[in-house]
C-alpha cells in the first residue's frame, strides 16, 4: 500500500490502540504491524503486552505506550506507580494514566496531584493524564486539567473510550484551558477521517483510536468505504 502525503500527515497523529479485554498475542502482532505499515508513531496497549510489543517493534520507529489504572482509575496510588514502573522497565516510553475520578468529585486535588506527580517523576516518561471528560462538569474539567499540568503531565487525554468518546467541544475547551502548555489527546469513538481532522483542527495533538488503518483507507477511497463500527 502506498501512502500519500495527506495519509501520512493524519497517520502522524494516531496512537494505534489495542485496549479490548480479549486482545490476544496474535492481535497485538497485527496491531504492531499496522502501526509500522501506516507510520503511526505509537501503539497504546495494556501493560501485560508491553514486553511483546517492544520485541515486535525492535528497530522500528513506533513507540510503545502503556495504559495505567485503566479504565476506571480506581486502583491505589501505590498500585498505579508500580504498574507505571514495571511498564517503564519493560520498555514503554509513554504512559496514559487514568486519574481517580472519585477524588476529583470529592475535591481531593492534592491526592490527584501527588499520584500523577509521583508517576511523572519516578518514571521520567511522557505521561498523558486521562480526564474522562464525558463524566465531568466544565468546572471539574478545568480543575483536573490544572492539577495534571501542575503535576507534570505532558498531555491531557479526553477519555478512555469506555464512557463515551472525544468531542470537538471538549478538545476546544481543553485547548483554551491549557493555552498550549501541554498536548491534547482526543480519544474514543473516532470513526471517520472528517471527525479526526475536525478534532485536530480543534486542537488535538494526538488521536487515540483502534480504527487508524480504517481512517487511512477511507482517505484513500472515501466513496467506496463505509465508516466502520467502533469497538
Swiss-Prot record:
It catalyses: 2-deoxy-D-ribose 5-phosphate = D-glyceraldehyde 3-phosphate + acetaldehyde. One of its GO terms (biological process) is 2-deoxyribose 1-phosphate catabolic process. Catalyzes a reversible aldol reaction between acetaldehyde and D-glyceraldehyde 3-phosphate to generate 2-deoxy-D-ribose 5-phosphate. Keywords: Cytoplasm, Lyase, Schiff base. Residues 209-231 are annotated as: Disordered. Pathway: Carbohydrate degradation; 2-deoxy-D-ribose 1-phosphate degradation; D-glyceraldehyde 3-phosphate and acetaldehyde from 2-deoxy-alpha-D-ribose 1-phosphate: step 2/2. Belongs to the DeoC/FbaB aldolase family. DeoC type 1 subfamily. Disulfide bonds: none annotated. The active site is at residues 96, 157, 185. The keyword Lyase applies. It is found in: Cytoplasm. InterPro entries: Aldolase_TIM, DeoC, DeoC/FbaB/LacD_aldolase, DeoC_typeI. It comes from the Bacteria. GO terms for cellular component: cytoplasm. One of its GO terms (molecular function) is deoxyribose-phosphate aldolase activity. PANTHER family: DEOXYRIBOSE-PHOSPHATE ALDOLASE. The keyword Mitochondrion does not apply. Its EC number is 4.1.2.4. It comes from Gloeothece citriformis (strain PCC 7424). This is Deoxyribose-phosphate aldolase.
